Amino acid sequence: MKAFEEEKGYEKFHLDGQTIVLEDYLEIYLDRKDELTEYIRKGNFQIGPWYVLQDEFLTSGEANVRNLLYGIEDAKKYGSVCKTGYFPDAFGNVGQMPQILKQAGMEAVAFGRGVRPVGFNNQVEGNDYLSAFSELTWKSPDGSELLGILFANWYNNGSEIPVEETAAKEYWDRKLKDAGKFAATEHLLLMNGSDHQPIQKNLPEALETAGKLYPDVVFLHSDFPTYIECVKKSLDSELSVVTGELTS
């Protein structure tokens, strides 16, 4: 919230797909609840849909469903629910998840694992992805389908963006090439952050530098709902359909 207040142009933060962290924060800073709620309501913070980010295979089906229901209910109290199922680092995703998420009103799902074939001793075989793109259609056994977004370059592929032009040029030459290699549209997803990493307060300046270096590219500090809406509007390729469990 301090960055929202003090850093001009710093406007978005995805709270890792869950709401439980809000309880911890408000136990200490209860006096800031109204301010926090206002940032969530305006879309600066994206929260939910989970109550706590889980590993689906380590919990029961009932626990997975209730985790989602409680997370949505909790997020609604603050005025906004991010309608993107989120599994950045789950070690496999259950086959019924598109069915569960769709019934809960989710519009897409983002995940980091499970779209490469797995061979003996859980070794990933070569570079043969089950989908040609980082965007795909994930289908449950009952036929339910959701747009899936694979973090093909992982969930920290846009972290620590340089502000200085020489370093930024080297950084963006590599990042744009890597993300564009898998993307089905011109909209490239770069995730600015990683585990245990502070926010990048000078992100607006870093994106300003990027815009100067690449005048034909629009760099936006955005969020999942905006990105997914843009992807859906721009899709002109038939996406691969991946059915059932995603395990790798």
Task: For the regions a language model picked out, list residue spans one by one.
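Catalytic-domain carbohydrate-binding cleft regions of carbohydrate-active enzymes
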Residues: 1-248
